[in-house]
Amino acid sequence: MNRVFLFGKLSFTPNRLQTKNGTLGATFSMECLDSSGFNNAKSFIRVTAWGKVASFIVAQNPGVMLFVEGRLTTYKITNSENKNTYALQVTADKIFHPDEKTTNEEPIKSTVVDSPFMNPKASVTEAEFEQAFPHQDETDFNNITPIFENDVQLEEESDD
């Protein structure tokens, strides 16, 4: 199972992306505090969103508190020497303000409080599984035109 839940602040204005077929995307960074209780370290986590989720996040201002539900994905970076490296990011499926009753798409149906992990069942129907873990088509990253005007800012913040 690949599910990620983040709670934190939007660290900078999201970067807009657009695929060749016109799908809106956005990359941004979430400032999250370590909740283990051992230290107060901050992590700056790279997040990507697509479609309605991206439309929601590009309208947000830095510093706003957000709850992100998504999954870990990898992406490839080719440097100037034509060498490939890979990195992890979170791909957001849902984003909402913790104090509001609606998400970027619809009324909240699965929050941490009523998630399938809190009330486990011996078996679930296919419809229940699909609602808890919606399937999304894989994105063809070769057809994306990135606009990374804030990536330097992301690198500077993550060096803390």
UniProtKB/Swiss-Prot annotation:
GO terms for cellular component: nucleoid. One of its GO terms (biological process) is DNA replication. Residues 1-99 form the SSB domain. Keywords: DNA-binding. One of its GO terms (molecular function) is single-stranded DNA binding. It comes from the Bacteria. The keyword DNA-binding applies. This is Single-stranded DNA-binding protein. The gene is ssb.
